[in-house]
């Protein structure tokens, strides 16, 4: 069974007789236990479609496609990719998928165009500055969207589940990257929260894939 979605991970855990918890659940409980209870126990929250989610998913796919091509083929091949078209196609696909799920439109052409243009500019900046973040010398792409499904220390019947956006190996050192998009920049609290997520993923990645933490 290929583990491509949170649902896949949850199904695998259930087959093992275990329950799952994601980082988003952990974070929600940490910030407000009552909110966590309402969402995951009482099931009183509903899915609210958002252009931010659509853009984030599409941008993930675009950057991951670029990096996958760069490391598996070459920098030249990655540079030849029509990343703008990849982004646009992914945004359209994700939007149509969510509209089908929720049964109504939740954005408009103007807003979609604005987010698309933001993505184009971000990718343009990234390609110009890529070398400062991702080099090829002594560097290996370990995986993209690598699954984590591992028993927690506090309860052997509960497993942490998640996906690692990008995992690199540089000079025999593992690096985990989590792609984030934001329209408001990154304040200290947001950076700290992202750090919590990466530290948790690092710990469980080391256990599951048998590498030094």
Segments and roles (model prediction):
Residues 51, 55, 115, 194-197:
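Hydrophobic (often cysteine-bearing) scaffold residues that line and stabilize catalytic clefts
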Residues 1-21:
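Long, acidic, intrinsically disordered low-complexity segments
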Residues 139-213:
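Mg2+/Mn2+-dependent nuclease catalytic core
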Residues 26-72, 120, 145:
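Nuclease catalytic cores
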Residues 15, 33-46, 98-103, 176, ...:
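Short amphipathic alpha-helical segments and their helix-coil junctions
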Residues 17-31, 158-169:
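An acidic intrinsically disordered interaction segment
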């Amino acid at each position: 069974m290929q583990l491509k979605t949170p649902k896949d991970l949850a199904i695998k855990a259930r087959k093992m007789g275990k329950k799952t918890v994601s980082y988003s659940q952990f974070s929600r409980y940490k910030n407000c236990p009552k909110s966590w209870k309402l969402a995951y126990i009482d099931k009183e929250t509903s899915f609210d479609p958002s252009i931010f989610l659509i853009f984030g998913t599409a941008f993930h796919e675009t950057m991951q496609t670029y990096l996958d091509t760069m490391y598996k083929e070459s920098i030249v091949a990655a540079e030849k990719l029509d990343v703008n078209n990849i982004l646009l196609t992914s945004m359209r696909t994700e939007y149509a998928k969510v509209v089908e799920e929720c049964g109504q439109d939740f954005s408009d052409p103007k807003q979609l165009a604005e987010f698309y243009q933001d993505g184009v500019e971000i990718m343009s900046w990234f390609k110009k500055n890529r070398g400062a973040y991702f080099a090829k010398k002594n560097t290996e792409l370990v995986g993209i969207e690598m699954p984590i499904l591992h028993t927690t220390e506090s309860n052997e019947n509960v497993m942490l589940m998640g996906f690692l956006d990008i995992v690199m190996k540089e000079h025999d050192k593992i690096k985990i990257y989590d792609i984030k998009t934001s329209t408001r920049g990154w304040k200290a609290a947001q950076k700290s929260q992202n750090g919590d997520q990466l530290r948790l993923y690092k710990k469980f990645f080391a256990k599951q894939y048998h590498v030094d933490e």
